[in-house]
């Protein structure tokens, strides 16, 4: 909801997920997409980048470069092909992939990142491609993310409550051991932080 508010409930969003296998990443991506579909008809997901699918994406980006349907920025990149030289998929870095997504989707207005690594990856890509008009929200709050928030490179972060998560887990385990049953969902809370409430 916070990203939708920042984007005036319209526009395209890029999702960066830290992986395609963990329950946390799957649920965050699915929940984000479901909320957009349910509440924000003028918003859509431009693409989802799963950071553990790098080999497949390296092949795709290299193929597009080699067929001429995509060109990387030439700013200081000596690895760009010249003439008939072909780019190997292994020449494509994660930075190249992020830049590819940002350049292939120039109309993206927002980005949702599923953890600290994803937040830092997209902000780094936006710095390289000089995109300063894309709203970024994500999870976690390590020192680097807080610095990005202070500088206005990140618009908001969902900060989980690790103490409550651990406490609730111990209580649930004890209740289970005593055959007392547990709630199907336990809300351990979170805090939404922005530059204004740090």
Q: How would you name each of these model-derived features?
A:
Residues 1-198:
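A residue-level marker of the well-folded mature domains of exported/periplasmic proteins
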